Amino acid sequence: MYFPPSSVPKRLVLVHISAVVAIKLLLIRSVSSLNMTNAYLQHKCIVSEGKYQPGSVYEKNLNIIIRASSAGDFRSGFDLVFRGKGSNFVTLMYQCRGDSYWSRCRSCYTTALSALRKRCSRNKGGIIWYDQCLMEISSIRNEGKLDYNNNFCMSNTKNASGSPLEFKQKMVDFLLNLGLKATSEDNMDKYNQAVMYAMGEERVGTKKLYAMVQCTKDLWLKTCYACLEWIILKESDCCDGKLGGRVFSTSCNYRYELYPFIKPTV
């Protein structure tokens, strides 16, 4: 198991209120600029895996691994648990974004689990993506394997000015370099586990790009880079020449924007 009095002059009251409003607006802009929300992005029910019956061994196994996974401390932002054999085998995997571990990861996990069980009720297989985490429940043992079938893309509606091809090439080079950083053998956390995540910024012409790449922690380093290379080079058509874009699979993902959206990690 990867187991927050009437005697006072009106002018002072107005100044005080204006200051409070200004502070609130500043906080809102700060949070917005770092995209500290946890928006729902996409989900997919894997109908080919079939459904389970209420009270079945499969459901009991699912509830057991949910309890086991929920009891974790979410410090690494990842867990993979499984139980059962044959038609009663079930596995649950979640991966939180690299800046969303501990309590933020737990919050996203709870939200994702509830939503996935509602959206894919009784399905043996299902995947859900949120801004800060990914969750997959499956009846198929697939840890360490690349998933080429379940992916999607989101992009900014605005195009880059100047040469779209030049912008794309610089963006691709930037993301691939982040992929190398994410899969470096030196990229370990304090528990001596591979981080499988990297973020950075780079100037492209007059603009500054902010980006991140990440893999699920069940992958080997080489497999992680292969996944990132695949989505960056093969699955990014919807992002071509766009001022921002994201590509997700169940194995890896990337994102780039013209504004900072990642909370710096310690």
Swiss-Prot record:
<dbReference type="InterPro" id="IPR002902">
    <property type="entry name" value="GNK2"/>
</dbReference>
<dbReference type="GO" id="GO:0005576">
    <property type="term" value="C:extracellular region"/>
</dbReference>
<feature type="domain" description="Gnk2-homologous 2">
    <location>
        <begin position="148"/>
        <end position="261"/>
    </location>
</feature>
<comment type="similarity">
    <text>Belongs to the cysteine-rich repeat secretory protein family.</text>
</comment>
<keyword id="KW-0732">Signal</keyword>
<dbReference type="InterPro" id="IPR038408">
    <property type="entry name" value="GNK2_sf"/>
</dbReference>
<keyword id="KW-0964">Secreted</keyword>
<feature type="domain" description="Gnk2-homologous 1">
    <location>
        <begin position="40"/>
        <end position="142"/>
    </location>
</feature>
<keyword id="KW-0677">Repeat</keyword>
<dbReference type="InterPro" id="IPR050581">
    <property type="entry name" value="CRR_secretory_protein"/>
</dbReference>
<dbReference type="Pfam" id="PF01657">
    <property type="entry name" value="Stress-antifung"/>
</dbReference>
<feature type="signal peptide">
    <location>
        <begin position="1"/>
        <end position="33"/>
    </location>
</feature>
<protein>
    <recommendedName>
        <fullName>Putative cysteine-rich repeat secretory protein 20</fullName>
    </recommendedName>
</protein>
